[in-house]
Regions:
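C-terminal leucine-rich, beta-strand-based interaction scaffolds used for sensing/assembly
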Residues: 82-83, 315-420
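Short acidic, S/G/P-rich loop/turn micro-motifs used as interaction or catalytic elements
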Residues: 56, 194-199, 393-394
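P-loop NTPase nucleotide-binding core
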Residues: 45-48, 52-185, 226
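Conserved beta-strand -> loop -> alpha-helix junction used to position metal-binding or nucleic-acid-contacting
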Residues: 75-84, 244, 310-321
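A short acidic (Asp/Glu
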Residues: 60-62, 88-93, 198-204, 230-234, ...
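A short, basic N-terminal segment
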Residues: 1-47, 52, 67-74
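The catalytic "switch" region of P-loop NTPases
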Residues: 166-190, 194-286
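Amphipathic alpha-helical "lid/sensor" segments that cap RecA-like P-loop NTPase cores
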Residues: 274-335
């Protein structure tokens, strides 16, 4: 498969590219994990949705937002994507007060998304105009401000004044007014692509904004990546927020049924695909629905060869893409180059260890244990990078032996195990 074809196939499986009308029919609503996450997204309180790229965070957020639009028994929902955050990186060196302008950009996107949610129903068009007048944050002006910040353009006097006027208090007031106008009692704020991993300075600022927006009537939900998400001195995971993990372990009891439900929603001929193919690609997907869908699509579209040849090529292409993405971190953040290199070496060592442990065993063993005392800060950082990239699954710690020792357990990527 060509690189361009691989990209096209991946984009087809991204929830960002699924039209709203198809989102519902392509959602596995009976999935155990999905039901848990959907409930958390619509609940009160601040939650972080934790999982690597492709595990369904965007899909779940967009679906939760959509189900709230026509159901007044549910909260007023606002969906915001921050996937263009990297465009603000130049501001860190070109502006005198980049955090202030980042605040204006982030809060501006929340306001614009609120207007969009309110106007989703045509009958609410006048409510948006009234809201703009009440809070003094005109939609058109905000759009030009956000655009200027994303293009690193100098702000006009009017835009600079508007950027100073956008405060957390004003945005909270707007959210409460919008919520009230729809007859709802509270708002869920679905903040997607909130990890901002390549710009830690902005991530810290962003999480402070999220924490500040939280109120008795506003419940922010932020999607973040596992492993590398840094929390600010004022944002404490576990105290300020509850983490909801959306990455399903290949060892979970519901793994097969959940993954296959997702595939069945996307492929009408899923049940005609040979079972051995499904089983292998499901394992190779390593709990990432987008990977599963992309590999199934790749298998279906490849020129006819032997099934085993085709499977090997599909899994190899997927693994190479994942490793390529992991290696690209070293180019984007040069100071991490050595950690990335060592991380790949450790991944390969874990794969060899798992393979060796299963040579003469009748029970498949996927776990690799690392003594907790060996997890120095730098070693932990290396594992965090592997986890964020979805190459290693954190299976939590366990206590063993006498005297008792604590081991951190990890599972190396399924595709790497299959290709070893």
């Amino acid at each position: 498969m060509k690189v361009s074809d691989d990209l096209d196939a991946s984009l087809e499986q991204r929830a960002d590219y699924i039209p709203t009308e198809k989102l519902v029919q392509e959602t596995a609503t009976d999935s155990v994990l999905f039901a848990t996450v959907r409930k958390a997204l619509l609940s009160s309180g601040l939650k972080t949705l934790v999982g690597p790229r492709g595990c369904g965070k965007t899909h779940m957020m967009r679906y939760a937002w959509l189900t709230c639009q026509g159901d007044t028994s549910k909260p007023f929902a606002v969906y915001v994507s921050f996937n263009k955050y990297y465009r603000l990186e130049p501001l860190l060196v070109s502006r005198a007060s980049p955090p202030d302008e980042f605040h204006a950009w982030a809060l501006g996107l929340v306001v614009l998304a609120t207007y969009s949610s309110l106007s989703y129903k045509a009958e609410n068009a006048t409510a948006v105009s009234e809201l703009e007048a009440k809070v003094g944050l005109p939609r058109a002006n905000l759009e030009t401000l956000v655009s200027a910040l994303e293009r690193n353009q100098p702000l006009s006097a009017e835009q600079a004044a508007l950027s100073r006027d956008i405060s957390v208090n004003r945005v909270q007031k707007l959210l409460d007014l919008a919520c009230s106008s729809t007859g709802r009692k509270r708002t869920v704020l679905l903040l997607d692509d909130a990890a901002l991993t390549l710009t830690p300075t902005y991530l810290i600022e962003f999480l402070d904004i999220v924490r500040a927006l939280k109120s008795s009537t506003i419940a922010p939900k932020a999607s973040v990546y596992p492993g590398t998400t840094e929390y600010s001195a004022r944002f404490h995971a576990g105290q300020d927020s509850t983490a909801i993990f959306v990455w399903l372990s290949v060892e979970a009891a519901e793994y097969q049924s959940d993954m296959d439900q997702i595939a069945r929603c996307r492929f009408s001929d899923f049940d005609q695909i040979p079972q051995d193919v499904v089983d292998l690609l499901r394992f190779a997907a390593f709990g990432i629905p987008r990977a599963y869908l992309t590999m199934l699509q790749d298998f279906k579209e490849r020129p006819a060869k032997t099934t085993q040849q085709t499977l090997n090529q599909v899994v190899e292409a997927h693994l190479n893409a994942r490793l390529g993405e992991f290696r690209s971190i070293a180019r984007k953040v040069p100071k991490l180059r050595e950690l990335i290199s060592v991380g790949e070496t450790v991944l390969n060592g874990m794969v060899r260890a798992v393979k060796a442990s299963n040579t003469d065993s009748t029970v498949v063993q996927l776990l690799v244990g690392v003594p907790k005392e060996d997890l120095t800060a730098i070693v932990q950082r290396m594992f965090q990078l592997l986890i964020e990239a979805g190459l290693v699954f954190d299976a939590m710690e366990v206590k063993h032996g006498t005297p008792e020792r604590i081991y951190q357990r990890f599972i190396p990527h399924g595709a790497a195990l299959l290709q070893s």
